[in-house]
From Swiss-Prot:
Gene that encodes the chain: pncB
Species of origin: Ralstonia pickettii (strain 12J)
GO cellular component term, pick one: cytosol
Catalytic activity: nicotinate + 5-phospho-alpha-D-ribose 1-diphosphate + ATP + H2O = nicotinate beta-D-ribonucleotide + ADP + phosphate + diphosphate
Residues spanning the membrane: none
PTM notes: Transiently phosphorylated on a His residue during the reaction cycle. Phosphorylation strongly increases the affinity for substrates and increases the rate of nicotinate D-ribonucleotide production. Dephosphorylation regenerates the low-affinity form of the enzyme, leading to product release.
UniProt xrefs under Pfam families: NAPRTase, NAPRTase_N
Coiled coil ranges: none
Name of protein: Nicotinate phosphoribosyltransferase
Amino acid sequence: MIIRSLLDTDLYKFTMMQVVLHHFPGAHVEYRFKCRNAGVDLVPFIEEIRAEIRHLCTLRFTDTELDYLRGMRFIKSDFVDFLGLFHLNEKYIDVRPAPSNDGQIEIVIAGPWLHTIMFEVPVLAIVNEVFFSRTQTHPQWEEGKRRLTDKLASLKRPGLEDCRIADYGTRRRFSHTWHEHVLLETHAQLGAQYAGTSNVYFAMKHGMTPLGTMAHEYLQACQALGPRLRDSQTFALETWAKEYRGDLGIALSDTYGFDAFLRDFDMFFCKLFDGVRHDSGDPFEWGERMLKHYDDMRAEPKSKALIFSDSLDMPKVIGLYERFHGRCKLAFGVGTNLTNDLGYTPLQIVIKIVRCNGQPVAKLSDAPEKTMCDDPAYLTYLKQVFGVQ
């Protein structure tokens, strides 16, 4: 079986789930799957994907895993007690061929947010591993190792000693086994330049630092949960601050486009949050504008962190490091390029929240192709409310 532990997911699923438990326990949501690769036929793998999901729904947290979570300073004891009773339920997820008959599949996850939030990452990892295990029966392990060695060597150049990367690649990894190899090799080769991993299972198993705060789904759901739509981003950040009281202080900047984020991210938030994460649009322009915004808001840029996580490879990491090093704190989250580069075209697959409490929700990304919404009229209205062209 592909997923062997409920910890085999990203840390931010736990940090968001805790907010859901304490602030939105009655929220209902719907997620949908999308494969952005043209011509990929996933239909032949449906039964195997279903079988893997069936197994996923039998898993429970072990006492050792619960003790590990309890040891995190920002995880509260009542949340761990809840996780002790938690398991994923098959009735909330449906996998079927798409009506278009073009090889696409539909994965619909619908139910209480508290009981569905944990599906996304392991289900994407399942789709990836099933697909590659069936289409690449003799993987090019040596080519993958060569590519990884070259990437890590590029970060060992003089002048890059403070350039640190983290693994954000669980959802689109080639396989569980390859993911673990990549992490161990990266840790061994980079030492202090390896910041940690978003994967909680591997962090626990290998004594690495687990990393993550919030994802777009949290800010999107707040469109339906806050007092009014225009204030939903502010509401999401304020609710986060109420829950974590200054901990986990990295805000995500592109749910409504960067211009709208800067309007909402006022002096209070600039001083309260430790930094901001970039996930779409030109990262160099974004970084310059963010540092200027900190200056304008009288927040010392050198005390703040810029986190880059959008489709990074090593040349882009190095370029960003050279541009911003010394001007602020820096961190880089590398995903697919780290955990799924054996020479094959990776799957561009996502599972996105599309509804909350029966209302459509959407992301107005700085990369238009990342926008995903099943209600065009709502998308138009959302753009109007947030002043997005």
